[in-house]
Amino acid sequence: MVSFSSLFVAACAAVTAFALPNELEKRAITSNEQGTNNGYFYSFWTNGGGSVSYNNGAAGQYSVNWKDCGSFTSGKGWATGSARNINFSGSFNPSGNAYLAVYGWTTSPLVEYYIMENYGEYNPGSSMAHKGTVTSDGSVYDIYAHQQVNQPSIVGTATFNQYWSIRRNKRSSGTVTTANHFNAWSRLGMGLGSHNYQIVNTEGYQSSGSASITVS
């Protein structure tokens, strides 16, 4: 079922072809788009299955509603990631497979990463190699690695590693100390490269649900 996550990387291949609009009036977004809104980078991608509607709100707030979706990714954050402390709060209400996670990419090496805070019915760790644990922000996280072979990425079709930290005590609000995860991954030989974008991401796959998240 790790292929669930691989479906989402198509978003990253597609975004290189998008124009990046500036500040936008509040409106429902239903097709692939990246840009800035109220000082935050945002990204939305869907494969077109089912019904998915994304809305940017004030500052770092966004909401997304989906029904019988194919697959989608959505969220707000920063155009350039870093080892920052990320605050998030709100509601995450999936019926089926969905993730709420800090999500980003690096280059040299090319890495796709997740710090997963909450998820629906499916824990993707069951399909990946367990590497260790890290304790951060009030919970143990299990660390996993997985190789994606000839899959879409931010640089086109490529082979690259995914790194994951999956929180045992799921939550929809709190602070993510990303440095704790990046350092733990590095100690396990899972090094990152130069940061590309970094968002608090709501993803869904063949599911329904809603989320309203504020990022800072």
From Swiss-Prot:
InterPro entries: ConA-like_dom_sf, GH11/12, GH11_AS_1, GH11_AS_2, GH11_dom, Glyco_hydro_11
Reactions mediated catalytically: Endohydrolysis of (1->4)-beta-D-xylosidic linkages in xylans
Keyword match Transport: no
Function: Endo-1,4-beta-xylanase involved in the hydrolysis of xylan, a major structural heterogeneous polysaccharide found in plant biomass representing the second most abundant polysaccharide in the biosphere, after cellulose.
Positions annotated as active site in the UniProt record: E112 (nucleophile), E203 (proton donor)
Record organism: Rhizopus oryzae (Mucormycosis agent)
Annotated metabolic or biological route of this protein: Glycan degradation; xylan degradation
CC annotations in GO: extracellular region
Record Gene3D superfamilies: 2.60.120.180
Protein name as catalogued: Endo-1,4-beta-xylanase 2
EC number from the UniProt entry: 3.2.1.8
Residues annotated as glycosylated: N87
Enzyme's top EC category: hydrolase
PROSITE patterns in alphabetical order: GH11_1 (PS00776), GH11_2 (PS00777), GH11_3 (PS51761)
Keyword annotations of the record: Carbohydrate metabolism, Glycoprotein, Glycosidase, Hydrolase, Polysaccharide degradation, Secreted, Signal, Xylan degradation
All copies of domain GH11, residue ranges: 28-216
Signal peptide residues on this chain, from the entry's feature table: 1-27
Predominant localisation class: secreted
Summary of temperature dependence: Optimum temperature is 70 degrees Celsius.
Entry's localization field: Secreted
